[in-house]
Amino acid sequence: WKIQLENTTDGYHFPMVHKSWMASVDSETADMMSFMEDPQAETHALGNGHSVGIMATAHVDLDEDDGTEEIQPRFNHLVEELEEAGESPERIRRYMRSMHGCGFNLNMFPNIAMSSAFFRVLIPISVDETEIWHMALGMDGGPECVNRERLRIHEHFQGPYGFGSPDDAEGWDRVQIGAGGNPDMPILINRGLNREYRTENENWPTSHVTDETGMREAYSMWKKMMSDD
């Protein structure tokens, strides 16, 4: 279950493991998730094993909108439907900017995660088996057409026929096989230690979203809970 927990705030794997998904979406969505060289894309260790990874910085707070972001053409049919329903331009813009969910992934130690627009519950079955529940998130009271489209986006990534989850699962299987080849081999989680710093107000350990700050936080808490100290 720990490898699935790592996955949520690990930005490093995304462009490689999810290359097929990136190739299957429109260029605007792919650009939105191109955070490898974005200095504002960071992971914060929140304490008690929790962490948050900022993936799409422009969508972290939907109340902050300078008006420069263009609505993705793939959602033009929704814009037209909402205009016909009498929705204001401001509300329509907010709906469209929220189509992919929030701009961050949140890990709640030990087994709950929220990734953009879905919840994930990790249920350990044995040392080498984990059951994962995915729950798509919609808008409470939001337009039906918007929630329907968000569900289609969820299905495109998740599920056995999605372009995202099957690649994650394949990676998890290979990591499990590799770890079983030498159980005594130490596994390093030191990526980004050289550039990790603490935020001024919260004192959160922080580094780039492609670093392993969130993993170090989770394993530190796991080690603490498993000890007799």
Place the predicted regions along the sequence by residue:
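C-terminal catalytic domain of Rieske-type non-heme iron oxygenases
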Residues: 1-229
